[in-house]
Regions:
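Pre-Walker A (Motif I) flank of P-loop NTPase domains
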Residues: 1-5, 66-67
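Conserved glycine(s) of the Walker
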Residues: 14
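Active-site flanking loop/helix segments enriched in acidic
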Residues: 151-183, 211-220
């Protein structure tokens, strides 16, 4: 039976270098290669729908011919991953690149055809770890393990940028104060470590997603933090001591605040983790200062 390997990783994470080690036994289908062949530019992003429709068809055809296939692309969209996997009948392996974004940015600058820091930061906002997607095996690959840090290191992000939430009346407290309040409450109530870690780090992505524009591009007075949970999840995932249960909570913690949560919850295989999300939401809401102005000391 044929074997299919899908890489997941942002630009500069070493996907292609790692995949090329297996070129003797697999047909490597590269999105960059297809872009250059079809449109003459590996950085072309204007034909993505057409491009991936062609790529997915070619992958399915190769597997139907009983050939082993490696799909080398960022593959950050869970929806697109699931769509392709549902059409493939073979052993399916995910290789997800566990490389800190700072390292990816540095590696990208060394490349002849750099995508740029802004593109990489946008990619992180779409990151999602492949829970319940149909893979038979998930391998975490870190070719730059010397740059990995324990998760506690990421608390230093609070000193790298303006800490104010700028979204009164929902938060008068700072971002770091909110996370500290959540963590303190979890420790006091003797929550398990996986849960306390999520409480401590769930909003670290806000330091990289703050904007004063809504999704329509209209300027707003209150700060927005669209997709911060995905950035938080990526930052935690690239720590050397990450675990998938904490990652699941961080990645999905905003779902309980939004419509459609119960419909999503019913589809999950691990209902204990879904209940963790429900409980997490209570901490997230309770550990805010919403009635009086908060002054930084």
């Amino acid at each position: 039976m044929a074997e299919f390997i899908m890489y997941i990783g942002i630009s500069g994470s070493g996907k292609s270098t790692h995949a090329n080690q297996y070129k003797d036994n697999y047909v490597i289908v590269s999105s960059d290669g297809y872009r250059e062949k079809l449109y003459g530019d590996i950085n072309d992003q204007t034909h993505n729908n057409e491009l991936f429709s062609i790529i997915h068809k070619d992958i399915i055809d190769l597997i139907n011919e009983d050939k082993n296939v490696i799909f080398d692309a960022t593959n950050l969209s869970s929806k697109h991953r699931v769509s392709l996997l549902s059409k493939i009948k073979c052993r399916k392996i995910c290789r997800i690149m566990q490389v800190p974004f700072e390292v990816c940015i540095a590696k990208d600058k060394e490349r002849e055809r750099s995508v740029g820091e802004s593109v990489i930061m946008k990619q992180i906002r779409h990151f999602s770890y492949p829970f319940d997607e149909g893979f038979d095996e998930i391998e975490v690959i870190n070719p730059y393990s010397q740059y990995s840090f324990p998760y506690s290191y990421f608390s230093t992000y609070s000193g790298k940028d303006e800490d104010n939430h700028y979204c009164e009346p929902y938060h008068y407290e700072t971002i770091s104060h909110h996370c500290a309040l959540c963590k303190k409450s979890g420790v006091e109530k003797k929550e398990p470590l996986k849960f306390v870690e999520a409480l401590a780090l769930h909003d670290v992505g806000k330091y990289f997603t703050r904007s004063f524009f809504n999704r329509k591009g209209e300027k707003v007075e209150r700060a927005t933090y669209y997709d911060h949970q995905n950035v938080s999840a990526y930052i935690y995932f690239t720590s050397k001591d990450f675990n998938t249960e904490t990652l699941f909570i961080i990645q999905n913690h905003m779902r309980a605040h939004l419509d459609g949560f119960e419909k999503w919850a019913k589809k999950q295989s691990n209902q204990d983790l879904v209940n963790d999300i429900r409980r997490f939401c209570l901490y997230d809401r309770a550990c805010r200062i919403i009635e009086v102005n908060y002054e930084r000391v």
